[in-house]
Design a protein with these regions (language model features):
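Conserved ABC ATPase signature
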Residues: 140-144
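Conserved ABC transporter NBD signature motif
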Residues: 72-83, 87-88
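Conserved ABC ATPase "signature" region
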Residues: 112, 116, 121-136
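Catalytic Walker B motif of ABC-type/P-loop ATPase nucleotide-binding domains
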Residues: 165-169
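ABC ATPase "signature
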Residues: 224-225
């Protein structure tokens, strides 16, 4: 019996792409990430949600190892982000919200420079076509619209052919059709086993893509589970109202 449960535990651990335990981060006397624990399985889409200032960005930075946590442990693909960065980031894609690129650098040049950083890559021309940017190949990045830049940043995150990708504010700046096109592309990648960790302020997007979610409020976990579980444990039936109830409870109480 003991061997049976040990086998189950090992299989579960092998299937876990991201594991975070008791993560904490403070700035002075202000705790911005308070004892957060989560796990994300292979091929799963996990959404980290919360109002501005809830601690989402700091949590992601601590998970990626770009910001030092005060305490807690993090593993991505079984590796410690702060100790095994080179090996880890061969297998992790990160979408950056804002980046300063050389003036007049072309889309194709930026993609080629990104490809040179990795051993095994996805053909960026295929990705540009999937995300509706193939006609911008020779365009300067500075001349792209906000929505086009957003899609390009997703493409750059996918170029290293990652096993897990972090997408921050996934489709901000995109129109309805472009957002749905991005959803479709990511759903196809998920079917191939890609693990996706995302943040978003669009609840229809979260409902469409996410297998599980975590909602933060002032650095604390106020909900963790599936969207169905979130709805069932609230007084609301629409997920957007459920999210507001969890993330911005004071505002909602004024209207109840």
């Amino acid at each position: 019996m003991l061997l049976f449960f040990q086998k189950i535990k090992e299989e579960t651990e092998l299937n876990t792409t991201i594991r975070v335990e008791h993560l904490k981060k403070s700035y002075g006397n202000t705790c911005v990430v308070n004892d957060i624990s989560l796990s994300v399985n292979k091929g799963e889409v996990f959404g980290l949600l919360g109002a501005n200032g809830a601690g989402k960005s700091t949590t992601i930075e601590c998970i990626l190892g770009t910001r030092q946590a005060d305490s807690g442990t993090v593993e991505i693909l079984g590796m410690c982000p702060t100790k095994e960065r080179k090996c880890l980031f061969e297998n992790v894609g990160v979408q950056f919200q804002e980046s300063n690129y050389q003036d007049k650098i072309l889309v194709s040049e930026l993609c080629e420079e990104t490809q040179c950083l990795y051993k095994e890559v996805t053909d960026y021309k295929i990705l540009l076509e999937q995300f509706g940017l193939s006609d911008k190949l020779k365009s300067p990045v500075s001349e792209l619209s906000g929505g086009q830049k957003q899609k390009l940043f997703i493409v750059l995150a996918l170029i290293p052919n990652p096993k897990v990708v972090f997408l921050d504010e996934l489709t901000t700046g995109l129109d309805t059709k472009a957002r749905r096109d991005v959803w479709k592309c990511l759903s196809e990648l998920k079917k191939k086993g890609l693990t996706i960790f995302l943040t978003s302020h669009f609840m229809d997007e979260v409902e469409n893509l996410c297998d599980r979610i975590m909602i933060l409020k002032k650095g604390n976990t106020v909900f963790s589970g599936t969207i169905e579980e979130a709805i069932a444990s609230s007084p609301y039936k629409e997920f957007e109202e459920v999210y507001l109830w969890y993330a911005e409870e004071e505002m909602m109480n004024e209207n109840i």
